[in-house]
Amino acid sequence: MNDELDTTLDLPGIELQHLLTDPDPTGTRPRRNLQPRNDPLESETLDDWLLTAALPAVENRAALVLEHLIQNTDRTVGARLAGEIARRYGDVGLPPGTIRVTLTGSAGQSFGAFCINGLHLTLIGEANDYVGKGMAGGEIVIRLPVNARYASNENFIAGNTLLYGATGGTFLAAGRVGERFAVRNCGGVAVVEGVGDHGCEYMTSGTIVVLGWTGRNFGAGMTGGVAFVYDRENKFDQRINPQLVRAERIANDADETRLRDLVRQHADATQSAWSRGLLEQ
């Protein structure tokens, strides 16, 4: 032990000799791990394929359309591509809709994480948790499967904690989403057809539209932004957390126009019969 180290008088019974002993007094052994990486034995991931396929378009700022199947073992799809766009162009990203990717199937966790300007992701199917986590721009759209015959507003299409920490971008989903939707949202825009408990928790800015059912404790810790909620059952006052937010009717033309534009955008992008029906009312 180094004799220069001070002694802590109130802990005289603690002996650190073995913890502080130099494991290699000769200095001949490596001080870092030199073993080969033990990566999983798996083929190229969907995210790898997406980055490779889109790289020339990113480099040349050229328009590109891609299609592929997706399954629930495909996690964080789009994150590497978003990272490459950010590395080259920073927060500005690419012009809107430069790279358009359509995926069909069930997406694994964190689909569209860190989405950025210029990246448009469309999922035909369903998604797990953390869709749009940390997204800063771009657009994520989730549509019903082609053969779906059920009512979108009565069924869940994505999991929990969507748009966690988003600072921008747009998220549109033809169905309900799970708990803690838009938690810590700070600038993202979203339209969904229902949310679970704790919606818009700790939200500081942005715009959220809920075209239907909401769970309990909505708006807990919410200090900014706007949420438009279709209170079909007239029970929203029982589900909102009144500590920091209040519920009120739309009282001006600007808010009404903004809401209608967002619902129309949702209907056009998701092909939702539910939002189309609301527009006709």
Whereabouts are the PLM-identified features?
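Long, distal/terminal scaffolding or interaction modules
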Residues: 1-281
